Amino acid sequence: MRQIIIAAGIAILVSIMLTPVLIRVFSRQGFGQEIRDDGPQHHQKKRGTPSMGGVAILAGMWAGYFGSHLVGIAFGSDGPSASGLLVLALATMLGGVGFIDDFIKIRKARNLGLNKTSKTVGQILSALVFGVLVLQFRNTDGLTPGSPQLSYVREIATVAMPAAIFVLFCVILVMSWSNAVNFTDGLDGLAGGCMAMVTGAYVIVTFWQYRNACSTHPGIACYNVRDPLDLAVIAAATAGACIGFLWWNAAPAKIFMGDTGSLALGGVIAGLSVTTRTELLAVVLGALFVAEIVSVVLQIAAFRTTGRRVFRMAPFHHHFELLGWAETTVIIRFWLLTAIACGLGLALFYGEWLATIGD
């Protein structure tokens, strides 16, 4: 628990202190965000707001993770784990893709950065590296960071995938989650606030898995997760980094996280879902992100097949703005929906444990 608190604390401090530095530097360099002309017109006043704030989020995550381990090692705790490093590496690789995308947008003064093919290739390569490595690094208990079995709140024994299919599954997960968070990042503080709650929920999930790990507490309801405590540290560092960034990103935003932040944070959800054996539970915890990407898919599918749109604009947070909702109203209500989804996800997680104990 000490390491979890330290990770969150360091991440908050680094993120909240580094972000204003980035605001000043990026403002001097003219690294401002371009705004879509077809979006809500009141968004045009945001043109020129510094972007690439995801750099501060990633810095907070790295500092929180390794800072907590430096303290932990001093008290005799284990160092970084394969699971934690893989999730952090996935987030960083995706953040790198996002950084290139953001930089091109800024240099060319347009709302489009990398072309779709280049961006997709970057995401796929990041996912492939993660998918292959997550089945390596077997520990003394025979556990690898990931499992080829599909999982809900623990592995589903009847649904096992060959290694190649599992890697493809990881690609789909990473692509889906990174794009889902990217689509959600369209209003001030929306994605950051939702991510803080989802990763906060993952702190609870992973700490519970640690307290009921099969390696230390064998039983019918124990969890076969390789490094649950270290994954809790990763989740706490991510939540802390998002909270620190949110101080400056809340409406009216002084800086945007950009694709640097949104792709990286989507990678965190994908990575945690695989390494904690909760791929299906993640859909509940991150239901708001799922709804955002589904709204985009529905909009495209409906327009291409019928010539009509389901929403006035997608992602659907803009739909509510065009209906007349104030931006802050949309943000707060979506935060509330995320809090409800996280509460439901945690209830399902704990309920499954109680049901297993009862059996």
From Swiss-Prot:
Taxonomy, superkingdom: Bacteria
Pathway info: Cell wall biogenesis; peptidoglycan biosynthesis
This protein's GO CC annotations: plasma membrane
Listed EC numbers: 2.7.8.13
Family annotation (Pfam families): Glycos_transf_4, MraY_sig1
PROSITE patterns with a match to the protein in the record: MRAY_1, MRAY_2
Transmembrane segments: 3-23, 55-75, 84-104, 117-137, 156-176, 187-207, 231-251, 255-275, 280-300, 334-354
Subcellular location per the Swiss-Prot or TrEMBL entry: Cell membrane
Cofactor or coenzyme needed: Mg(2+)
Protein task: Catalyzes the initial step of the lipid cycle reactions in the biosynthesis of the cell wall peptidoglycan: transfers peptidoglycan precursor phospho-MurNAc-pentapeptide from UDP-MurNAc-pentapeptide onto the lipid carrier undecaprenyl phosphate, yielding undecaprenyl-pyrophosphoryl-MurNAc-pentapeptide, known as lipid I.
Database matches in HAMAP family: MraY
Protein name (database record): Phospho-N-acetylmuramoyl-pentapeptide-transferase
